[in-house]
UniProtKB/Swiss-Prot annotation:
The lineage of its organism: Bacteria, Pseudomonadati, Pseudomonadota, Gammaproteobacteria, Vibrionales. Its EC number is 5.4.99.12. This is tRNA pseudouridine synthase A. Signal peptide: none annotated. It comes from Photobacterium profundum (strain SS9). Gene3D superfamilies: Pseudouridine synthase I, catalytic domain, C-terminal subdomain, Pseudouridine synthase I, catalytic domain, N-terminal subdomain. The gene is truA.
Length: 261
């Protein structure tokens, strides 16, 4: 039997999603909790491997299990064995041809900037703080040059192992809600550090250091050195993963919880 789960986590204290030797990861914590419920080792496969310090409200995983458990065991039961910064949001049985990574048609991220002269205390690890005023309208204008199919070499990390830098960008929207500037970005897939490098570049536009048209020029150069610096991990959330309707996965609020959808 194959089970899919929706996972939410605060990535601040973890080395990232992927299990690694001698360091704490979200995957390892989740697999331990699932194994406790199944009473046997469980391995999970995820939609996207987030980096150190990156959060998730819409991560999707799947695993195979041959024990009979009520579905509530994979939500409330698993949550009882997870730390407070990781939670299962939903669970459902899926067909054997479902794969959390390879069945996905798009991923959606939100990068959240707390744009205030004073640093936050409550949301210190859940947002990226920038003290100078940001013009979110110019950031949004610049972001529209990213929509469509492009070679994203200019916002690709040097250590990226993807075979191709080409990606299909569905949307990039920049908006403001009070002191929060939100970059909402969706693509079929992402190269390494793509969202954070885009965020760093858009911040340069928002600060008035570059014009919106500069973003188009950055893409055309196909050179990581011309784009903005990599924005901090703290503000980045994997908020949703799209799948074909045939799999019947539940939907849930994008989050994070302090932002309306």
């Amino acid at each position: 039997m194959r089970i899919a789960l929706g996972i939410e986590y605060d990535g601040a204290k973890y080395c990232g999603w992927q299990r690694q030797v001698d360091v704490d990861s979200v995957q390892e914590r989740l697999e331990k909790a699932l194994s406790h419920i199944a009473n046997k080792p469980i391995a999970v496969f995820c939609a996207g491997r987030t980096d150190t310090g990156v959060h998730g409200t819409g991560q999707v995983v799947h695993f195979d299990v041959d024990v009979d458990r009520q579905m509530v065991a994979w939500t409330i039961g698993v949550n009882a064995h997870l730390p407070r910064d990781i939670s299962v949001r939903w669970a459902t049985q899926v067909s054997d041809d479902f794969h959390a990574r390879f069945s996905a048609t798009a991923r959606r991220y939100r990068y959240i900037i707390y744009n205030s002269a004073l640093r936050p205390a409550i949301f210190g690890v859940g947002v990226s703080h920038y003290h100078g005023h940001l013009d979110e309208k110019k950031m949004h204008e610049a972001a529209q040059y990213l929509v469509g199919e492009h070679d994203f070499t200019s916002v690709r990390a040097s250590q990226c192992q993807s075979r191709s830098p080409w990606r299909a960008m569905k949307h990039v929207n920049v908006s403001r809600q009070g002191d929060f500037v939100i970059i909402d970005i969706k693509a079929n897939a992402f190269v390494h550090h793509m969202v954070r490098n885009i965020a760093g570049s858009l911040i340069r536009v928002g600060r008035g250091q570059e014009t919106p048209e500069w973003m188009k020029w950055v893409l055309e150069q196909k050179d990581r050195r011309v784009a903005g610096e990599t924005a901090k991990a703290a503000g980045l959330y994997l908020v949703a993963v799209d799948y074909p309707e045939e799999f019947g996965l539940p939907s849930s609020p994008l989050g994070p919880i302090f932002l309306p959808d």
